[in-house]
Amino acid sequence: MTEHNHDSQLEINNEEELLTLYDEEGNEVLYRKVLEFFHPEFKKEYVILAEEGAESDDDDLIELVPMINEPDENGEGGKFLPVETDEEWDMIEEVVNTEMDDHDHDHDHE
């Protein structure tokens, strides 16, 4: 099995921002973007969203919603698409776990 080192190629932006999306019934739902990254192997940009106001004592209980961010012709904005392959789910889980662990350790030293 080969060892993958994503850190040298993975572009990560963890600047938080609020986004309004619509659920299946057309209701507005406010999400906080907790992580955004481009993965060179899949050549896609991903965003990890958490429903705003979905607070919990245990961070693991907050449901994270990964989406593919497909830019428009101008390379801006675009639309969110669902993640469909198991390979992408596994990669996203690995990136999120690594980033969240790093984020937790950063706060331990403040």
UniProtKB/Swiss-Prot annotation:
Coiled-coil segments: none
Signal peptide residues on this chain, from the entry's feature table: none
The cross-references to Pfam families, in alphabetical order and at most eight, read: DUF1292 (PF06949)
Q: Which domain of life is it from?
A: Bacteria
Q: Which InterPro entries match?
A: UPF0473
Protein family per UniProt: Belongs to the UPF0473 family.
Protein name in UniProt: UPF0473 protein SSP1146
Q: Which organism is it from?
A: Staphylococcus saprophyticus subsp. saprophyticus (strain ATCC 15305 / DSM 20229 / NCIMB 8711 / NCTC 7292 / S-41)
